């Protein structure tokens, strides 16, 4: 198999709560946990939650190819949409790329606190794309326990992965239909420039890893539309 730049078989090792991948050369390699962790959560929930349906989009990291081209009719009966494709174990992405994905009441602050999730912002991802295409229910992107995505030092924290699974399961079992209409973001110029912090004056710090992913994904998508 191929994960990242490594070609070959990967052996999985677990020590306490940490999972890493070791290549045939005996060195640590990328697990592909971004976003195998999210896929695992989705498949596990299909075992226990018959009301659930799942969509797996290709090409998220090169411009949200799948979510940009899917039929939105798939979501006509959705109560809400949850994506599990965020590193670490505590981020609840309620705004992505200046697009508001849900209100603060989804789900309740008490439920977020129970599982240790904290509201924060992100950039380009599938739920943001769906929202921009007219998704009219609440959505979010959740941390699911992977760290150092795209690098050979990537690893998974199993405890955080399972915590995300349990969080999503409780949302599915307890939260009702949650309407939320898309509102186009505004980008006011602050001063003589219009960078990320100008668009988000309250944002405490720039997430450069997400910023770079977003920049190169959009460049890649634009390049291949041209040629």
Where are these regions (language model features)?
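Gly/Ser/Thr-rich active-site loops/lids in small-molecule metabolic enzymes
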Residues: 101-112, 160-168
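Zn-dependent metallopeptidase/amidohydrolase metal-coordination segment
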Residues: 118-164
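Short, acidic Gly/Pro/Ser/Thr-rich loop/turn segments
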Residues: 2-4, 62, 89-91, 147-149
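His/Asp/Glu-rich mid-to-C-terminal helical/loop segments that flank catalytic regions of hydrolases
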Residues: 148-207, 212
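Long, low-complexity, intrinsically disordered segments
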Residues: 203-227
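Acidic/histidine-rich catalytic neighborhood of metal-dependent amide-processing enzymes
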Residues: 27-105, 115, 119, 126-127, ...
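Generic recognition of long tandem-repeat/solenoid scaffolds
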Residues: 17-31
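Acidic/His- and Gly-rich active-site-bordering loop/insert found
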Residues: 1-21
């Amino acid at each position: 198999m191929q994960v990242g730049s490594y070609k070959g078989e990967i052996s999985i090792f677990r020590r306490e709560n940490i999972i890493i991948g070791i290549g045939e050369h005996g060195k640590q390699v990328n697990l592909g946990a971004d976003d195998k962790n999210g896929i695992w959560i989705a498949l596990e929930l299909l075992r226990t939650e018959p009301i659930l349906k799942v969509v797996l989009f290709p090409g998220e990291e090169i411009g949200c190819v799948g979510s940009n081209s899917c039929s939105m009719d798939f979501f006509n009966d959705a109560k809400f949409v949850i994506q599990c494709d965020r590193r670490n174990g505590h981020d609840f992405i309620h705004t992505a790329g200046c697009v508001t994905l849900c209100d603060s009441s989804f789900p309740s602050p008490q439920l977020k606190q129970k599982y240790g999730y904290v509201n924060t912002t992100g950039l380009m991802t599938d739920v943001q794309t769906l929202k921009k295409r007219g998704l009219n229910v609440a959505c979010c992107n959740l941390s699911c326990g992977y760290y150092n995505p795209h690098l050979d030092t990537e690893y998974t924290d199993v405890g955080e992965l399972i915590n995300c699974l349990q969080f999503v399961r409780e949302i599915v079992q307890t939260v009702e239909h949650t309407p939320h209409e898309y509102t186009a973001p505004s980008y006011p110029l602050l001063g003589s420039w219009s960078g990320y912090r100008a668009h988000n004056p309250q944002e405490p710090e720039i997430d450069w890893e997400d910023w770079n992913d977003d920049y190169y994904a959009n460049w890649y998508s634009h390049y291949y539309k041209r040629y």
